[in-house]
Regions:
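N-terminal hydrophobic or amphipathic helices/low-complexity stretches enriched
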Residues: 4-75, 218-219
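Second-shell loop/turn segments in exported
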Residues: 25-31, 46-56, 83-87, 173-175, ...
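Noncatalytic luminal/extracellular "stalk/propeptide" segments of secretory-pathway proteins
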Residues: 49-144
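Active-site metal-coordination/substrate-binding segment of hydrolases
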Residues: 108-141, 146-150, 225-258, 262-268
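Soluble metallo-hydrolase cores and metallopeptidase-like ectodomains found primarily
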Residues: 164-246, 268-269, 273
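Short helix-loop-beta-strand segments that form the rim/entrance of peptidase-like active sites
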Residues: 264-289
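Metal-dependent peptidase/peptidase-like ectodomains
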Residues: 281-379
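His/Asp/Glu-rich mid-to-C-terminal helical/loop segments that flank catalytic regions of hydrolases
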Residues: 379-419
Length: 419
């Protein structure tokens, strides 16, 4: 009799648990790559004008992400959804770009976008007047000018393509950097030889701005376990002097949208064993400023954490690339080993690279086990053609399947997935 009671009790509990799991599973949000694509399209639309750090559009993007975190019921990390920091940003002025070559008898203007175009590297000085009386070094692919106004670098654009725009590097020794076509290069050389004066004005300046990272957390059940960090940067390059927008769909509306969809999914699961921190990082294009601040400001809370950063997700027929910092190459990385094994077991093509090319580097430099997951297709990166048209939902799903297995293994048990 006791055996029958035990048997039926066990059977009842098993069936009850099964029904509970099924009921709870109905409330689990399933990751949807098409929603990621829709959000990429939205964040990389002309309304956001390239999301340049320090711009109104960058602020708008941060507010949208913050409200999304709130809507998903993520808790504020350290009692706040925002982490403020101050850094130097490229700021657009209201003036008109020009490049004038003249002497007492004649003048001409170089054509913006055909002969020359500013690179976004630095704007310590945005106006230069120079001639062959100044210190000028001429090379086959560059011209360096130095006078009382500062230092100016011209460089010859590859294949005369002026569409590429570099990340901002205000620590660079050159105060202004301008890309030239071969025609623009030759016109400058000819003008200097003829003793003419050259005057260029670029409508950007350096300015200190208050920026924010956006942060949220799903609290874990075991505070002794180091949290898992999931990150992506939401800033991009803005627009150039004639308002051509650098949309930044792959770089990195894709990683931001992937992070938001992942947060949507994980927020509907049960309580994880370890806490999961979501951070939408700012100012990656200014030299990893947002991630550097977050890593240093929160070091003692995350020093034993693993960090997965998403940067450029969604390229068709492109292997997943796991990127770690140059100085981290000789370190043992649990997160790299684990993700690599998942790819091997699931026959997913992947590569491993060591570059300080994204926000993982800020964590690696502090000895924190971090990597970036990336589809490393650079054919449209930092050009106005980086649009949603080149985003592939199947590639997004492939990344999700790999990441999902890692997160479930690291943060959840079979039971806590549902409870």
């Amino acid at each position: 009799m006791k055996k029958k009671i035990f048997y039926f009790s066990t059977l009842f509990i098993t069936i009850l648990c099964l029904f509970i799991c099924i009921a709870l599973n109905d409330h689990i949000y399933n990751f949807n790559a098409e929603n990621v694509v829709k959000n990429i399209k939205y964040l990389s639309s002309s309304s956001f004008e390239g999301r340049r750090s320090g711009s109104e559009e960058n602020i708008l993007t941060s507010e949208i992400i913050k409200n999304k975190f709130k809507g998903l019921k993520l808790s504020p990390y350290k009692n706040s959804y925002t982490e403020e920091f101050i850094t130097t940003c490229p700021v657009k002025t209201d003036e008109t770009v020009y490049f004038k070559i003249f002497n007492d008898n004649e003048s001409e203007y170089l054509k913006y976008g055909e002969d020359y175009k500013e690179d976004m590297i630095n704007f310590k000085s945005n106006s230069f007047t120079f001639s062959n009386k100044d210190k000028i070094n001429i090379f086959s692919t560059s011209i360096a000018v130095s006078n009382d106004e500062g230092t100016l670098l011209f460089y010859l654009a590859q294949n005369d393509d002026l569409s590429f725009r570099s990340s901002f590097m205000c620590e660079l020794r050159f105060d202004l950097v301008i890309a030239l076509s071969s025609n623009g290069y030759n016109k400058i050389i000819d003008a200097l030889k003829a003793g003419k004066t050259l005057n260029v004005y670029i409508p950007f300046k350096n300015e200190a701005k208050k920026l924010v990272n956006i942060q949220g957390i799903i609290e874990g059940s075991d505070p002794s376990l180091a949290p898992l960090l999931l990150t992506a940067h939401f800033d991009h390059l803005g627009s150039d002097s004639q308002n051509n927008i650098y949309y930044g769909a792959l770089d990195n509306a894709s990683g931001t949208s992937f992070l938001l969809e992942l947060a949507n999914t994980l927020s509907t699961l049960g309580k994880p064993k370890r806490s999961i921190i979501f951070v939408a990082l700012n100012a990656e294009e200014l030299g990893l400023k947002g991630s550097s601040f977050f890593a240093e400001n929160n070091y003692f809370d995350i020093k034993n954490s693993k960090v997965i950063n998403f940067d450029m997700i969604g390229v068709e027929n492109c292997p997943i690339t796991f990127i770690q910092g140059v100085g981290f190459k000789d370190n043992s990385s649990n997160i790299l080993n684990s993700l690599s094994n998942i790819c091997l077991n699931d026959s997913v093509d992947y590569l491993v690279e060591y570059e300080n090319s994204s926000d993982h580097a800020s964590f690696n430099e502090l000895g924190i086990d971090a990597l970036t997951i990336c589809h490393s297709d650079k054919s449209h990166i930092h050009t106005p053609t980086d649009t949603v048209d080149y985003i592939d939902s199947n590639a997004i799903n492939t990344v999700y399947k790999v990441v999902n297995k890692e997160i479930k293994k690291d943060c959840y048990s079979t039971v806590t997935t549902f409870i």
